Regions:
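C-terminal accessory region of SF2 helicases/translocases
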Residues: 1-77
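Mid-to-C-terminal oligomerization/interaction "stalk" domains of large proteins
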Residues: 2-31, 95-206
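C-terminal helical accessory/scaffold domains
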Residues: 56-120
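Intrinsically disordered, low-complexity mixed-charge segments
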Residues: 206-214
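Non-Sec secretion/translocation targeting segments of pathogen effectors
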Residues: 214-220
Length: 220
């Protein structure tokens, strides 16, 4: 009986391990069919967007950083502080704080502003293929610096996206190999289930043999 109990525990443990393995296979199949391809598609579009926007900026931004030109409203500004001041004025004059409003253009990118009511901040979006967002502060010149930092940061974000894409592609290839692997303890589980079935059969036979036969007494 003790052997039967020990074997039953081992079989239950192996069955639980197999159920976990099966669940893992289902997750891998789901990732292979949907999740990884979707992530790859999004990252490829993001990479293409960064590449396009970086090329737009390269073509439209003068090599000489002192040669500044920004359109705000209907005016062209060549002074950074004046351009930054005009941006703040445009923010203050916005009719609706709930909608994104286009206020100008810089380096071939549309400049759009919206109000983040949760953080109580104005947010500028440089819009090309992608939207490149940053918070506006109260310093006119500082906002122009922030804008340039966003443009300069595109290369780093492109590199991050490319690294993520390579990682997801690697995860997809790994998942395709892992999903082919059978449950490693399948043979052991089958063997112990057969042993347990044999022990159960023997125990049932012993119980039947030990059951006393009660004969009916003759009726007088």
């Amino acid at each position: 009986i003790k052997e039967n109990m020990d074997l039953d525990i081992q079989v239950s443990r192996l069955k639980l391990m197999k159920a976990n393995h099966t669940s893992q296979i289902y997750r891998l199949e789901d990732n292979i069919a949907k999740n990884y391809p979707k992530q790859i598609e999004i990252l490829q579009e993001r990479i293409q967007g960064f590449q396009t926007d970086m090329e737009t900026v390269r073509k439209n931004l003068p090599a000489d950083k002192d040669n500044f030109s920004m359109k705000v409203g209907n005016r062209i500004f060549i002074d950074k502080k004046e351009a930054g001041t005009a941006i703040l004025v445009m923010c203050q004059e916005m009719d609706s704080l709930q909608q994104m409003v286009e206020i100008g253009e810089y380096a071939g990118m549309k400049m759009k502003v919206t109000f983040d009511s949760f953080n109580r901040k104005f947010v500028m979006s440089l819009k090309g293929e992608l939207s490149h967002n940053f918070e506006l502060g109260s310093d006119a010149f500082g906002n122009i610096t922030r804008l340039h930092n966003v443009l300069d940061g595109m290369a780093g974000k492109l590199s991050e996206a490319e690294t993520k894409l390579n990682n997801v592609i690697h995860q997809l290839e790994t998942a395709k190999m892992e999903v082919q692997k059978p449950f490693p303890e399948e043979a052991e589980l089958k063997e112990k289930m057969e042993q347990l079935a044999q022990l159960d059969a023997l125990l049932n036979m012993d119980e039947k043999a030990e059951t006393p036969v009660v004969e009916n007494e003759p009726t007088v």
